[in-house]
């Protein structure tokens, strides 16, 4: 018997068009305009409203019901549109709270993001008595084992530590119904691809897979064929991905050492609200932090080599507004939510164009306004033009009155 295929919005492509591929949302995806009409459990609805959500965002209106139905889902949504809550609500709805075993596994590319997902799950599931553990590198293994032995409904973590816990048999996978890959473009990029496959091999064959990210390059979608079954696609066109409300500028600097002077000139502008400055390497972050402090500027900094405790206290300070300027590597660029950030400076242009949107997506969340300033050396002009073309956007030279735009 022939299996009926799910209708999809058609895409007619010649071979040479493959680089410009744009999926549409699958035709059978309907829009559910309110949380009340999603068929969610009462104690979860209470948690959603207590958390401050009133109306679901565009991605939530489309994806939550599909995930709850048990479909594999590829969801693409801009940074700051509520995609974390999309899968958190879906995961919580699917739990059997009576069974104290791990039923959902969420993988994220950074420790901070995994920690934030855990916080959102616990907040939304506040009235459900949900147990949720964040399983991340750089923390005490014994504590992980103790928490997992106690029983956790949901585990959010980084692939390396999660796989370690599965191998030690501390994280039992037999009851897992759902695997969520957050920031999937980063996760499936070289570094995490093998680790995800390692984890996936231990999951029950019928595990539902949800993949969520702001950018989904074609080669990532190719990989999803390996472990997703007839996935529903909820995608925005790539050209809409540069975030509205974010003004993007560049400052031409002839030499690397001039970047520092330019940054010092901009410091007063930085502290109007809060700012994040991105460098491409940990060494550059340390160097720039030290140089700024020597010049009597107050800055904090964060990168992946710092001990977990230190990273957490730096994030806490920054979230509370106690520190105003944070210098970081791309460890910060993925999904971290600090609403007051309205200025991003790319001290170094990112190494790939997907990262650009993750960085500038930090500012102007949920439609707030934001400004991104790119420091561009002569040999960076080509990369900048490539970013402009890729996102169909315009990056103008920075005006003198940039402070008025923040």
UniProtKB/Swiss-Prot annotation:
Keywords in UniProt for this one?
ATP-binding, Cytoplasm, Helicase, Hydrolase, mRNA processing, mRNA splicing, mRNA transport, Nonsense-mediated mRNA decay, Nucleotide-binding, Nucleus, RNA-binding, Spliceosome, Translation regulation, Transport
Query: Could you tell me which residue ranges the Helicase ATP-binding domain spans?
Result: 64-234
For this UniProt entry, what's an example GO CC term? nuclear speck
**Residues reported in the UniProt entry to bind ATP:** 55, 60, 77-85, 337, 362-366
- Enzyme Commission number(s) from the entry: 3.6.4.13
Which transformation does this protein catalyse, written as a reaction? ATP + H2O = ADP + phosphate + H(+)
What Pfam families does the record tag this protein with? Answer: DEAD, Helicase_C
The molecular function terms in GO held by this entry are: ATP binding; ATP hydrolysis activity; RNA binding; RNA helicase activity
Domain named Helicase C-terminal is located at 245-406
Task: Report the superkingdom from the record.
Answer: Eukaryota
Q: Which GO terms describe its biological process?
A: mRNA splicing, via spliceosome; mRNA transport; nuclear-transcribed mRNA catabolic process, nonsense-mediated decay; regulation of alternative mRNA splicing, via spliceosome; regulation of translation
Q: Which ranges belong to the motif Q motif? A: 33-61
Name the family the entry cites.
Answer: Belongs to the DEAD box helicase family. eIF4A subfamily.
**Quaternary organization:** Identified in the spliceosome C complex. Part of the mRNA splicing-dependent exon junction complex (EJC) complex; the core complex contains casc3, eif4a3, magoh and rbm8a.
Q: Name the PANTHER family on file.
A: ATP-DEPENDENT RNA HELICASE DBP3
Q: What does this protein do?
A: ATP-dependent RNA helicase. Involved in pre-mRNA splicing as component of the spliceosome. Core component of the splicing-dependent multiprotein exon junction complex (EJC) deposited at splice junctions on mRNAs. The EJC is a dynamic structure consisting of core proteins and several peripheral nuclear and cytoplasmic associated factors that join the complex only transiently either during EJC assembly or during subsequent mRNA metabolism.
Name the record gives this protein: Eukaryotic initiation factor 4A-III
Q: Which gene encodes it?
A: eif4a3
